[in-house]
Amino acid sequence: MKIKTPLTVKAFAKINLGLFITRKRDDGYHTLSTLFAPIDWYDILSFSAADAIEMSCTNPDLPVDDSNLCVRAARLLQDEGGVKEGVSMLLDKRVPFGAGLGGGSSDAATVLRVLNSFWDINLSSVDLHRFAVSLGADVPYFLEMQGLAYAGGIGDELVDLNMTIPWFIVTVFPCEHISTAWAYGHFHRRFELERPDLRALAPQLSSDGKTELLPLFENDFESAVFEQFGNVRQVKTDLLSAGALFSSLSGSGSAVYGLFEGESAAREVMAAMEAKCYPVSLTPPGFSMRQ
């Protein structure tokens, strides 16, 4: 089935609630333990029929050639399904890149999901998962999950926790682009430490008073990132000073989020961050990626 009329889809971002780097494998990859939670910050992807795979983007700093994850995802499906037609993709880039929010991974997952249907390839969930992992460790989450999920392995071993975050989430981008490679090269190793079981702790995070558990959800990248980027550290300080129950770096940064019980406090700190010209988003309690 060709895409007869332009199709527009949101590709939501995520934050990490806790992120423990557990070991370095022989192949150079690091294993981790983390929780992924969706946030109401998204890119918009538009698809229309074309003779070849074409890509354009509203952000001129992002490549639109075969190094782009969206293009790679489209080519994987085209080759696997023996598809003759192409697709024109327009990426309205709203989620900051180099922020630890998984925007590029979410975009790639959206391409896999949309084109698998509209090219009538109808790959199984197992095959789609395999393609997702080949594109990036975060991609399977955006392809398969909707709410809070536990991730192990390199981030690709997922468990749906069938729950959502019960607080307002304010997510701030301090205008620093931090590469994942830099973060892994500078984080302070703590492999020998016994770490909390994030998967077991997650169900206890509810609106009925388990906020005392939140400090257990540390991010192993924080100390190295905060040492190098003082403005990123300051965002966490500001969020906590504004009444956040908890604040943390997301992924390898530079985005920082705060969890708030009340909407008014969340909106006040949003205004303060916007006054610094920092992009910011507000996610309501109970948010999921189901549209």
Swiss-Prot record:
Top class in the EC scheme: transferase
For this protein, what is the EC number?
2.7.1.148
Q: Which reaction does it catalyse?
A: 4-CDP-2-C-methyl-D-erythritol + ATP = 4-CDP-2-C-methyl-D-erythritol 2-phosphate + ADP + H(+)
For the ligand (ATP), the binding residues are 96-106
Q: Which Pfam families match?
A: GHMP_kinases_C, GHMP_kinases_N
Q: Which GO terms describe its molecular function?
A: 4-(cytidine 5'-diphospho)-2-C-methyl-D-erythritol kinase activity; ATP binding
Gene Ontology annotations of biological process type = isopentenyl diphosphate biosynthetic process, methylerythritol 4-phosphate pathway; terpenoid biosynthetic process
Keyword annotations from UniProtKB, A to Z: ATP-binding, Isoprene biosynthesis, Kinase, Nucleotide-binding, Transferase
Q: Does the keyword Amino-acid biosynthesis apply?
A: no
Q: In which pathway does it act?
A: Isoprenoid biosynthesis; isopentenyl diphosphate biosynthesis via DXP pathway; isopentenyl diphosphate from 1-deoxy-D-xylulose 5-phosphate: step 3/6
Which residues carry out catalysis?
14, 138
Q: Which family does it belong to?
A: Belongs to the GHMP kinase family. IspE subfamily.
Please give the function described in this protein's UniProt entry.
Answer: Catalyzes the phosphorylation of the position 2 hydroxy group of 4-diphosphocytidyl-2C-methyl-D-erythritol.
* Protein name according to UniProt: 4-diphosphocytidyl-2-C-methyl-D-erythritol kinase
